[in-house]
Amino acid sequence: MSRRKMFLKMVTASLLRRRSRMLIALLSIAIGATILSGLVTIYYDVPRQMGAQFRGYGANMILVPSGEEKMTVEKAQECLTVIPKDQLLGATPYRYVNVEMTSRQRTFVAAATDFEQVQSTSPYFAVEGRWPEGDREVLVGKETAETIGVKLNNVIELSYKPEDTYVKNTLNMTVVGILETGGDEEAYIFTTLKAMDALTGVSGQLDVMEMSVSAASEELENYAAEISENNSDMSARLVKRVTKSETTVLAKLQSLVFLVTAVVLLLTMICVSTTMMAVVSERRKEIGLRKALGASDQSIRAEFLGEGMFLGLLGGILGTALGFAFAQVVSVNVFGSSITFQPLLLPITVIVSMGIAALSCLLPIRRAVEIDPALVLKGE
Amino acid sequence: MILRAEKIAKWYYRKSGESNRFFAVSETDVQLESGSLTVLMGRSGSGKTTFLHMLGGLLIPDAGKVWVDDKDLYAMNDAELSRYRNRHIGIVSQGHTAVQSLSVLENVMLPQMMYADTDRINESADEWLARFGMEHLQEAFPSELSGGELRRMSIARALAGKPEILLADEPTGDLDDENTKLVMNALREAADEGTAVLVVTHESDALDYADQRWQMNAGVLTK
């Protein structure tokens, strides 16, 4: 038998002989590792998950012309290429024009847009009736609808007089939906871009492009800066209200994750340390004998450290698997989507678990090294 | 090899302070030489075990030095002293001490396995176990042995490494007459082969095997 084999046998046999104690230590390491790997998984996945949740509160970036000139649809599309397609959840163009409602002799703001995109960038827009499907259908904001007494399926006449003519362009539009947002949008009338082009006689112009991008605050800032740098006539800005609250919530959540992980790992250390102290007390005679036979303090340290790290290894592997299951349950129940396993998490959890186990063994090892063989062999 | 104790002493303080210094072993000069078997007799509590531990590098004397040839045992650091003890000094302790997680054979091999691994270790351990009638217990664990068997196992453990100095504390304490003879003959044989053997005992039978006889009373050694 080789020395290494005997060392391994002593470590494993010692662990097996004290199964119940070691099971407690192993369980506490596994629980610590579970919380560690589970929370770290959530920690790294939360920005993505929370980003998706926050996208429900509206666009987080807007694109506007930096000068007096209007923005063209082509220019806006060009700017969007900076943002990776998988991160761009929606981009809604808006063109605002003051139009006259002939029958009421009043002027309102008409917002021309792409209704399909609106639903992805502003999912909180609530429509009574339905979304417009054709160019002769409009949404009327709730406030406007109440002011002018318009109801679903009413036909309204919108007119616009271009500056360079004396003739008004007029379109008859059917109200297919009443829009409720709780914001300024309730004062607008929403049409398609095509209808607005027909009404104004000018096509391809935009005032603003609202974007919903699934990215962290810093990344968003980088995209905005890149767009503004590449296009001197365009300016990309973050919707601070949304991005700031997203960053604040994430920072608080991540601090909480760190705190909980730290507390659980501390408790794990206390539990493992107490168990190993009891093991040292039980093996006092044996340690004394081994010292008398020529074992150095270093070899006693190595043996207990070996036992602790072996427990850390097992607990780390077990904890990684349980942690992933834990993170999956949390993700599915809280965010409604599953997460993918990060392979790097296994070595990280195992190394941290082994480190925690090694740290927990420091005090018991000190006790073991301090055992006086002369006292033990005398039976004291 | 010569083991020499030079004015070694060990004392303890009682609670009332330095005036009540209690000597476990009073200042003593002794010498153990290769090829001799020395028997140290004395009553329980007379300081025999303390004296043996000081000679074996297990207990630092409060005064004096222990020399092995020209090496001051207690001038070495822990790693050096541990290795030296493992290589040159065999110790049979008083109680029933064994590593519970190892088999009888592995326990006997343990001291030699600490710093080396060769097949000869196995042979030597086999031989000593056979000699003490324990060949059938090689794979057994210490918890399955009787007191006498544990005692013989620890003597086999000390002898298997062929130490140059062998310090045995009550090596025949749990043994019947037959096994006492077996063990004392083995110790005698080790001395005849060049080992310096010290047997600490309170059994007068051991005196028949001795080259030197010492007596200890209340920490004072007389030759």
What are these regions (language model features)?
Chain B
Residues 160-164:
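A short, proline-enriched helix->beta-strand linker immediately N-terminal to the Walker B motif
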Residues 102-110:
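Short coil-to-helix segment of the ABC ATPase nucleotide-binding domain corresponding to the Q-loop/switch region
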Residues 166-169:
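Catalytic Walker B motif of ABC-type/P-loop ATPase nucleotide-binding domains
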